[in-house]
């Protein structure tokens, strides 16, 4: 893929932090290293209409997005972790995209199930395409921007993403890490509801969201079936060994672990309070207190 063209008429683009590599690189490397130039070059070659068609097929709302090359980098596309989890589930599910949902069932006070979510899925690509994408995205966690995100003793495929702030390219407004196994998709976003000069992230995804994602995935994955991928890592297929030394400083790890420990502790306190509320039969009053506690946790 083209990894050197930085200007298309009035549109200018560069790789994150101005990273320079070879003028042309294989697709698996472009994905693993989350490079902007190859993505824009691909949309330029295939056409913006194809990019919009793909976005809509994977459940993204493209109605208010400008039809410009920046769409290759997600420019103007509003999304959220749930939508991203649904989209990436198609790769984990061999081309079938399930409908993401929060509520699986609703029970009344007697425990009777009064409503159940009906699972549905649609094919958005064939199995061969999904397998090729997974093969390439396995490299994200072994040789690319997701090395710091890679959970110990587990194999994941996926993608990272970073958005620079408009007022300082050294700061970021959004950090994404999305990883999946054949059993589960974990979609993680780090940022502020509104980014300004008082609210921004001072690190890149590999030094920020990555460490939180790793801790989250190492907590979740032991409770999954542990299915393994049937495709090989594209780096391995091309004779390249994994760069399995994590990009993580002890300070970054201790800060992240401390944050997660604090969240887990507060969450457990909330659960304990909910249990006491039920046992004391003061449901309404106690439930409000518990809810207020949850809200305070995220303020």
Task: Name each region found by the language model.
Residues 1-51, 68, 97, 109-134, ...:
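Conserved catalytic neighborhood of penicillin-recognizing serine enzymes
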Residues 1, 73, 188:
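Hydrophobic residues at beta-strand termini and immediately following loops
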Residues 216, 249-294:
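Composition-driven recognition of long, low-complexity, acid-poor segments enriched in small hydrophobic
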């Amino acid at each position: 893929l083209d990894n050197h063209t930085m200007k298309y008429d009035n549109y200018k683009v560069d790789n994150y932090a101005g990273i320079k590599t070879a003028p042309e690189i294989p697709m698996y490397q472009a994905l693993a290293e989350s490079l902007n130039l190859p993505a824009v070059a691909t949309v330029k070659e295939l056409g913006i209409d194809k990019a919009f068609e793909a976005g809509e097929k994977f459940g993204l709302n493209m109605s208010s997005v400008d039809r410009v090359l920046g769409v290759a980098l997600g420019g103007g596309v509003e999304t959220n972790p749930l939508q991203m989890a649904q989209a990436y589930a198609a790769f984990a599910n061999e081309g079938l995209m399930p409908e993401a949902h929060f509520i699986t069932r609703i029970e009344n006070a007697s425990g009777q199930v009064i409503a159940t979510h009906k699972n549905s899925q649609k094919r958005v690509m064939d199995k061969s395409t999904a397998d090729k994408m997974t093969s390439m995205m396995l490299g994200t966690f072994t040789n690319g921007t997701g090395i710091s995100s890679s959970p110990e003793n587990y194999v994941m495929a996926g993608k990272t993403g970073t958005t620079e702030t408009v007022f300082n390219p050294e700061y970021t407004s959004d950090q994404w890490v999305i990883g999946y196994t054949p059993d589960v998709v974990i979609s993680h976003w780090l940022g502020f509801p509104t980014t300004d000069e008082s609210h921004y992230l001072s690190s890149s995804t590999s030094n920020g969201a990555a460490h939180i994602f790793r801790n989250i995935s190492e907590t979740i994955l032991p409770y999954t079936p542990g299915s393994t991928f049937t495709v090989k890592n594209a780096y391995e297929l091309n004779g390249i060994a994994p760069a399995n030394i994590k990009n993580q400083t002890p300070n970054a790890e201790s800060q992240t672990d401390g944050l997660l420990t604090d969240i887990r502790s507060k969450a457990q306190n909330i659960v304990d309070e909910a249990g006491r509320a039920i046992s004391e039969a003061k449901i309404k009053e106690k439930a409000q207190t518990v809810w207020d506690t949850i809200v305070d946790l995220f303020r």
